[in-house]
Each structure stands twice: as structure tokens, then as C-alpha cells.
């Protein structure tokens, strides 16, 4: 893709926020002890425009972040080239374990994936967050793409994987 096309497909800040708000799953990359990349699919919270995760305090990703807080997060969508879009965030992860932040992240995750939060849900959210930490991603670089901006004709879903979609 040429330089002009790259500039054409970039999402603005509002488009990025809307895309992240509507999407469901992110891929989180952390670095293992020997430098290997540890990739995991994660549900996430979106708080004040920032991506947050919740995870077990002793999970491999939490161990990796404590050792090396550099992370990458990608959220992507689209099954044909003309509809590919996504956001990739490079940044620093901060482990947060204060009760107010944990509850805020827990409520956001609950609402994104289960439905409206009410006071009756509090025991479920508390249980969900038991022995967990929140992870805040502080971005240092954000890249985005939306191939729909290229104005290509609709492409059919085809190939050996099409039958499984």
C-alpha cells in the first residue's frame, strides 16, 4: 500500500473511539522472560478513552507486565480486504489493584459483555474481580486502518476458509 493510500485509511480519534467501543475482543501482546511474545485474546474495558483489562493477579500476562510493562494491543475486524479495519496500540501497561479502579473496570467489563449493571449485580462483579488486578494501557503510539475508506468495490467472501464464516 502506497503512502497516499496509508494516509487515506487512517481513522481519526472519534472513529478510533467508536471502533473500540463497538468491538468485543482485543489481542494483548506481552513479553515473556526470554523475550518471546505472549499473545492472548482479551475482553476489555474502555474507560475515558483508554483500554483496560482485568486478569488474575498471578496470570502469565500479569507476571510479564510486572517484569516488562511494554505491551501492544490490537483490535481488528473484517473478513474481506475491502472491509479490514483495526486499531493497534503500543504502550506501557500499569497494574492497578486499588478497589475503586477494580470495581470500575469490573463494571465496565460486565456491561460490555453481560448487560446493564445494577446494584444487584455487585456480588457477581465482586466475584469476577476476586484475586484479579486491573491493567491500564497508556498509549505511546496508536495506528489505525479502515479499508472501507479506499472505496473499493465489495469483495465476496471466498477461498478455503469462506465456508467456515
Stretches with model-predicted labels:
Residues 2-27:
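Short, basic/aromatic recognition patches
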Amino acid at each position: 500500500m502506497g503512502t497516499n493510500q496509508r494516509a487515506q485509511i487512517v481513522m481519526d480519534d472519534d472513529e478510533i473511539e467508536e471502533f473500540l467501543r463497538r468491538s468485543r475482543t482485543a489481542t494483548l501482546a506481552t513479553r515473556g522472560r526470554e523475550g518471546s511474545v505472549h499473545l492472548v485474546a482479551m475482553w476489555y474495558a474502555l474507560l475515558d478513552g483508554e483500554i483496560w483489562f482485568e486478569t488474575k493477579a498471578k496470570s502469565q500476562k500479569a507476571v510479564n507486565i510486572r517484569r516488562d510493562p511494554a505491551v501492544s494491543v490490537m483490535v481488528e475486524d473484517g473478513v474481506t480486504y475491502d472491509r479490514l479495519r483495526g486499531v493497534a496500540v503500543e504502550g506501557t501497561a500499569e497494574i492497578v489493584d486499588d478497589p475503586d479502579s477494580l470495581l470500575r473496570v469490573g463494571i465496565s467489563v460486565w456491561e460490555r459483555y453481560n448487560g446493564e449493571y445494577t446494584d444487584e449485580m455487585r456480588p457477581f462483579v465482586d466475584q469476577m474481580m476476586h484475586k484479579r488486578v486491573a491493567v491500564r494501557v497508556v498509549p505511546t503510539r496508536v495506528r489505525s486502518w479502515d479499508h472501507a475508506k479506499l472505496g473499493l468495490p465489495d469483495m465476496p467472501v471466498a477461498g478455503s476458509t469462506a465456508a467456515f464464516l
